[in-house]
């Protein structure tokens, strides 16, 4: 029985299956944690969703910003961009079923036994574990409700970017969504910067990666995140694990086996990397909310 954690898949099903074959993944015994962004940019978003859903309780996943964007496109709130390559998913006969399954997935995973926390972008330094759980539950509740299109319509935007327990309504939900699925850099007081997409060494002062600021999360817990492909999993402090290594840009799909902290990688299959790079994209660029 092993715990496997995998970074952003982005529709790269063949690489996912090849990576799981390396470790002889057994859904009857093993648990698979996924950092979100299952869809977009890669060639097989539809089949990735079908496969992950078929694994049932063997999977513990979180939603990423591209997954939320897919929900908004399907709801008619956002435009379907050809570069995302999700049209086969939108047109699939089981699209309704898959979308309704997807919107009921969490935005935060916490395992108190393994002392593991997973969110697509990470945990804002302004939150402790209990605040993160509370805010995640609020987002999950509205996503799984009949009023979810109202939330999806309101989630796009960079403000508010400073946490306060006094935040309410859609503003509170937007902050929580940005913190859990879009965050990279923060100001020294923990306030989110939603503009800079650079690597840490090229970020303007006084911005710092969220994981380099003092945090309120219990240090006994490790934090798993994806989202930030240009990090290539490097430069993070002890107890923080960045697993997005840019498979859909020609990089790797990365798996971490938790029990022995061993990494496994699967290089992107060349043809798909060329398609994305020829379309003018660069590693680490994300859907803009």
Curated annotation (Swiss-Prot):
Pfam family, one: Metallophos
Enzyme kind, highest EC tier: hydrolase
Recorded catalytic activity of this chain's protein: P(1),P(4)-bis(5'-adenosyl) tetraphosphate + H2O = 2 ADP + 2 H(+)
Signal peptide: none
InterPro entries named in the record: ApaH, Calcineurin-like_PHP_ApaH, Metallo-depent_PP-like
CDD domains referenced in this protein's UniProt entry, alphabetically: MPP_ApaH (cd07422)
MF terms in GO: bis(5'-nucleosyl)-tetraphosphatase (symmetrical) activity
SUPFAM superfamilies: Metallo-dependent phosphatases (SSF56300)
EC number, as in UniProt: 3.6.1.41
Keyword line: Hydrolase
Record keyword ATP-binding present: no
Keyword Cell membrane annotated: no
Known function: Hydrolyzes diadenosine 5',5'''-P1,P4-tetraphosphate to yield ADP.
Family note: Belongs to the Ap4A hydrolase family.
Name of this chain's protein: Bis(5'-nucleosyl)-tetraphosphatase, symmetrical
Organism of derivation: Yersinia pseudotuberculosis serotype O:1b (strain IP 31758)
Gene: apaH
